[in-house]
Amino acid sequence: MFVDGDWRTAHSTTRIDLIDPATEKWIASVTDGDHRDVAMAAAAARAAASKWGRSTPAERADLLEALANAFERRQDEMACLVTAQNGSVLSRSRRTNGARPVALYRHYANVARAFRPETTDTAAGAIVRREPLGVVGVIIPWNAPQSLLANKIGPALAAGCTVVVKPAAETSLDSLLLAEMATSAGFPPGVINVVTGGRETGSAVVGCEEVDMISFTGSTPAGREIAARCGQSLTPLLAELGGKSAAVVLEDADLDVLAAKLIATCLPNTGQVCYACTRIIAPRTCFGDVVDEGCC
């Protein structure tokens, strides 16, 4: 685990083996964290939240920019590490777990620079004050872990929140590497914490009283369960669940290129992405041709 700016020995003694899906060889083992490990990480995040939340948007922007630079220097290492864990084609991993996270951290650095903690509407006699929520629990899947992680912790950090990250059990090493990068970039201890583990670890994050918000990407059934629990405690939840995206074919579409386009949109990452097209919508006037071309 990576907690409070350093590697920590977990309370849990259970380990999870990570296997390279391409070779079926053992890569490493990581802690299957329990509620005590989550509590340790959340306590560190809570302790860091006050000072981090009082930092200026410019200070947070500078650190996000530094993280982008640190990530960029090691992006190929990160891409190879993700591919070794989830089997993604390396060329794709270099985009989704290398170049894209770098761009995202730079984007959120710019968001932080433009952030205005307080605005005044003199006509309405109102003041709008934007304050960090506190500790955000982040739960991500294995298919594009670093893009998804950047899209979650980037805005949280920019807003002045601290985070407890629970990566997918299958892709744990890259999140630990990210935490190491963040420390080298200058993030204070406790701002970014990573607890590895499976379903029970994620459940502990959702149920932790020190966590003020949950950001989750994963399956629809898991999302329903998390939403129900967050509803009971009135914990804010941001959930990105399984999609049912459609490929829309218009009457003037070039059917000669349709099949290749469908493969690209329906089967990226062997179809293991939430936005993969699983439906085709076509006009009745060319429906038969679309079926014939799409099934070739």
Report residues per predicted region.
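Periplasmic-binding protein-like
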Residues: 154, 212-217
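ALDH superfamily catalytic-core signature
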Residues: 221-296
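A structured beta-alpha segment of the ubiquitous adenosine-cofactor-binding alpha/beta core
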Residues: 125-126, 194-212
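Residue-level signal for inorganic ion chemistry
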Residues: 24, 60, 82, 105, ...
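Conserved small-residue-rich beta-alpha loop and adjacent elements
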Residues: 114-189
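Short beta->alpha connector loops at strand-helix junctions that form conserved
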Residues: 161, 166-168, 196, 217, ...
